[in-house]
């Protein structure tokens, strides 16, 4: 169209909510104009009377660099020649009330180290990625049929230097990656890395959505960390907060003197619980900002997945006496997921949703929200409630370990033992377990066993792998000294071996989302607090038999029904002495005997360990009979 510039087209798409690479248009970009190198700045501030750029290059005097209002809807631009990377800057907003506000760039690629708040000019291009093999392998199989075991990591408190300083992204790559690889995790989930002013918000109160926090280094350092993860066959998931943002003066809040990124009306805008502001998802420009942000992390940082935080906060209007669905947010979520999967069909879009909203992990064309995974908060709450009860009381709570299978296939689930469950006096997983010292560890191993054998992908927060006794202390490193204690060291060995068993056992992940992949053997043995079930593989004769005993009693010659007339080998027993148990194991192969039991045509007799789990693999034999 004659007279319409590329800039005009991008502005039009931005206002329609369809500029999905808005980070290439807005922000600070190194470029050349009229033969001179410099940076082009662009910002959306429709309510401002004037916008200037103040920074180290002009003595923080914005009057020297007044931006031009290029578009009627409030997009301001300016090219400043002669400046390079590493310059500090802010937008100097002259509001309609003639107030002056200094604001960080919403699209800044880099920021000053807190408590300082300026944006930093930075050239993202130039990092040489070495993860082509990972990217190719990722496309070869649907995520649903892959093992997914996630190590949830808070970079600032995994380990700290002797003087209390943080390790950098690059430094952590030398320790975290081998550790995660050794233990058999398939993914690392990083708690939010977007820039945030307050350490103890853990990153959930963001000011810089396009800026990885400078606490741990520069953007290229984070790229290096992710690249190294990929080269060691570890995927990287990032916590992503799209519902609300930090209200600090330099951030998005009242950006140009008026509500811009947030809702206009106070009862919609204010998130009283967290002290933040809710994004106005009715604004198309906010759609462009957030969807572009998701695609930015995929394109520029090769992120493999998002755990989308606080989806319930998106789905329902805040501050209402009764739950009221937010149609703007539903449309936003559906569009977000459609655009992400158009970019990468094998991406992980994980909803952290505590509600019973239907079809969360169903495609948008079926009326679903379009995620491909959802945290199973119901399972987590039920199982932890059950495990915190004394063994004597568990027979009265038996439904808590069985109810999850009533809905396990209604969505695609991840089973989460996350940071939320081991903080704010909730106690660590180990400390939640009742009983004496030995019993706590036995029940920890039993909990991990049930977690690993139950349908659903897995997530475990750091420190859970070695049964840290204290809950998470976000200003300190993990209690690594516990590895000097025998029971903690053995707990870590058990978790590691359970994770590796999961990773190498197709039975435990290929049929995760198919009802034919699971069958109860005996779900009704409340009196003894024992559950037994089968995990089936895709191939004929593939099966694991799992028996979990939630009391301290030992049962010898305990018989359960099995589907195949073959031998069964114990592949994991949480009571093995090498894990700190009492060694009530089944060292010999168990031969199936003909005779109906639990609705199965054959049965095996075993020793059931106290406060423990035993897992048996059916030996595939040519001509083995199935009932």
From Swiss-Prot:
Gene3D superfamilies: Glycosidases, Golgi alpha-mannosidase II, Immunoglobulins. The active site is at residues 309, 352. Keywords: Carbohydrate metabolism, Glycogen biosynthesis, Glycogen metabolism, Glycosyltransferase, Transferase. One of its GO terms (biological process) is glycogen biosynthetic process. It catalyses: Transfers a segment of a (1->4)-alpha-D-glucan chain to a primary hydroxy group in a similar glucan chain. The keyword Transferase applies. GO terms for cellular component: cytosol. Pfam families: Alpha-amylase, Alpha-amylase_C, CBM_48. GO terms for molecular function: 1,4-alpha-glucan branching enzyme activity; cation binding; hydrolase activity, hydrolyzing O-glycosyl compounds. CDD domains: AmyAc_Glg_BE (cd11322), E_set_GBE_prok_N (cd02855). Pathway: Glycan biosynthesis; glycogen biosynthesis. Its EC number is 2.4.1.18. It is an enzyme of class 2 (transferase). Catalyzes the formation of the alpha-1,6-glucosidic linkages in glycogen by scission of a 1,4-alpha-linked oligosaccharide from growing alpha-1,4-glucan chains and the subsequent attachment of the oligosaccharide to the alpha-1,6 position. Belongs to the glycosyl hydrolase 13 family. GlgB subfamily. HAMAP family: GlgB. Monomer. NCBIfam families: branching_enzym, PRK05402.1, PRK12313.1. This is 1,4-alpha-glucan branching enzyme GlgB. The lineage of its organism: Bacteria, Bacillati, Bacillota, Bacilli, Bacillales. The gene is glgB.
């Amino acid at each position: 169209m004659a007279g319409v510039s590329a800039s005009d087209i991008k502005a039009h798409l931005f206002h329609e909510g369809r500029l999905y690479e808005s980070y290439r248009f807005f922000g600070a970009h190194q470029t050349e104009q009229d033969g001179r190198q410099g940076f082009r700045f662009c910002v959306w501030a429709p309510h401002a009377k004037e916008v200037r750029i103040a920074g180290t290059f002009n003595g923080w005097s914005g009057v020297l660099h007044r931006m031009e209002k290029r578009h009627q809807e409030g997009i301001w631009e300016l090219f400043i020649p002669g400046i390079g990377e590493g310059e500090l800057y802010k937008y100097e907003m002259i509001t309609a009330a003639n107030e002056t506000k200094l604001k960080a760039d919403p699209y800044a690629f880099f920021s000053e180290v807190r408590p300082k708040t300026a944006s930093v000019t930075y050239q993202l291009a130039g990092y040489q990625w070495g993860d082509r093999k990972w990217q190719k392998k990722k496309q070869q199989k649907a995520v649903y049929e892959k093992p997914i075991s996630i190590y949830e990591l808070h970079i600032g408190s995994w380990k700290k230097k002797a003087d209390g300083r943080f390790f950098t992204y690059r430094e952590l790559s030398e320790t975290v990656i081998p550790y995660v690889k050794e233990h058999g995790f398939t993914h690392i989930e990083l708690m939010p890395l977007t820039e945030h002013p307050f350490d103890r918000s853990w990153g959930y109160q963001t000011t810089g959505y396009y800026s990885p926090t400078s606490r741990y280094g520069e953007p290229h350092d984070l790229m290096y960390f992710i690249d190294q993860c990929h080269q060691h066959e570890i995927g990287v998931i990032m916590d992503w907060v799209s519902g609300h943002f930090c209200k600090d003066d330099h951030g998005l809040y009242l950006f140009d003197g008026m509500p811009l990124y947030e809702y206009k009306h106070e009862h919609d805008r204010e998130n009283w619980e967290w002290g933040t502001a809710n994004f106005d998802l009715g604004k198309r420009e906010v759609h462009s900002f957030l969807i572009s942000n998701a695609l930015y992390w995929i394109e520029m940082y090769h992120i493999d997945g998002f755990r989308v935080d606080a989806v319930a906060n998106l789905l329902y209007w805040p501050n209402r006496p009764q739950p009221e669905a937010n149609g703007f947010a539903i449309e936003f979520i559906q569009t977000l997921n459609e655009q992400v999967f158009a970019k990468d069909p094998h991406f992980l879009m994980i909803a952290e949703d505590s509600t019973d909203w239907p079809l969360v992990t169903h495609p948008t064309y079926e009326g679903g929200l379009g995620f491909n995974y959802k945290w199973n908060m119901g399972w987590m709450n039920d199982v932890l409630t059950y495990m915190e009860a004394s063994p004597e009381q568990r027979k009265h709570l038996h439904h808590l370990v069985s109810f999850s299978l009533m809905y396990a296939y209604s969505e695609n689930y991840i089973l989460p033992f996350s940071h939320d469950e081991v903080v704010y006096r909730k106690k660590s997983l180990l400390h939640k377990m009742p009983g004496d010292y030995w019993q706590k560890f036995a029940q920890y191993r039993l909990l991990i066993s049930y977690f690993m054998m139950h349908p659903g992908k897995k997530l475990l927060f750091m420190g859970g792998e070695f049964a840290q006794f204290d809950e998470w202390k976000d200003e300190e490193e993990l209690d690594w000294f516990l590895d000097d204690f025998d029971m903690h060291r053995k707990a870590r060995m058990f978790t590691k071996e359970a994770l590796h068993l999961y990773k190498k056992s197709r039975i435990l992940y290929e049929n995760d989302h198919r009802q034919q992949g699971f069958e109860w053997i005996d779900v009704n043995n409340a009196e003894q607090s024992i559950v037994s079930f089968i995990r089936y593989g895709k191939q004929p004769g593939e099966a694991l038999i799992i028996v979990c005993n939630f009391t301290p009693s030992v049962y010898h010659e305990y018989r359960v029904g099995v589907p195949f007339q073959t031998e069964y080998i114990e592949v994991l027993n949480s009571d093995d002495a090498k894990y700190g148990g009492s060694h009530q194991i089944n060292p010999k192969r168990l031969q199936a005997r003909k005779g109906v039991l639990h609705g199965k045509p054959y049965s095996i007799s075993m020793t059931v360990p106290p406060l423990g789990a035993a897992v048996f693999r059916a030996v595939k034999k040519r001509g083995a009979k199935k009932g």
